[in-house]
Design a protein with these regions (language model features):
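Short, threonine-centered small-residue motifs that mark membrane-proximal processing/anchoring sites
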Residues: 3-30, 167-197
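Mature extracellular "passenger" or substrate-interacting domains of secreted, surface-exposed proteins
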Residues: 29-177
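Short, charged juxtamembrane terminal tails flanking transmembrane helices
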Residues: 200-203
Length: 203
């Protein structure tokens, strides 16, 4: 599923690439599109940044995954960009965790950026070169700042190094919303009911 989503996003990126490359760029990277995994009802992405300073509003109306695609330009000695996102929760359920993952050769730089819940309590953050996994001891019902999208004093953006990504190639950044256990239970129950209906119809 994720590879299919990435392929779709990157095919869109490829279409945008010719347009982006046609004009001179003073930046090493450009955002070219986003795709939500199904179900995508009520989900949206709005870009507020550009070039080497990327910032987004990401709205989750359903618990799913969004993948952002970026095209690189190797016109800098040390290609990197700052990244921040206000991740809004419109699902009606708490976020119990959020996972941010890089694909395509990009990696997170040290030091780590900020993770700021609005009402939830952050239990821990595990950072690897390609993933940031966040968990909550009390779920987040409203929004979380990944990096510093709101310009808060003392907060900092996440830095992403894409020096290993070839010029003109794309890399992806995905954000996955992890629902509370009760949501999983309801989802599994719903899938079980659907399976029962299908089996009865087949008979």
């Amino acid at each position: 599923m994720q590879n299919a989503s990435l392929a779709s996003v990157f095919s869109t990126a490829a279409l945008a690439l010719a347009t982006v490359l046609a004009a001179p760029s003073a930046h090493a990277v450009e955002y070219v599109g986003a795709r939500f995994a199904a179900p995508a009802t009520g989900n949206a992405v709005v870009s507020y940044g550009s070039g080497d300073a990327q910032s987004f509003d990401i709205d989750f109306g359903t618990m799913t995954r969004v993948t952002l695609a970026f095209v690189t330009f190797r016109d800098e000695a040390a290609p990197s960009m700052s990244f921040s996102a206000l991740i809004n929760n419109f699902t009606g359920y708490n976020f119990e965790g959020l996972n941010v993952r890089l694909t395509g050769g990009a990696v997170f730089q040290s030091p780590s950026g900020s993770v700021i819940p609005t009402f939830g309590t952050l239990a821990g953050t595990v950072v690897t070169p390609t993933q940031v996994a966040m968990s909550f001891s009390s779920g987040e019902p409203y929004a979380l700042s990944f990096g510093n999208p709101l310009g808060e004093v003392g907060a900092s953006d996440w830095m992403i190094d894409f020096s290993s990504v070839e010029s003109g190639a794309t890399f992806g950044l995905s954000v996955t919303a992890v629902p509370e256990p009760g949501t999983y239970a309801m989802l599994l129950a719903g899938l079980g009911l659907i399976g029962t209906i299908v089996r009865r119809r087949q008979r």
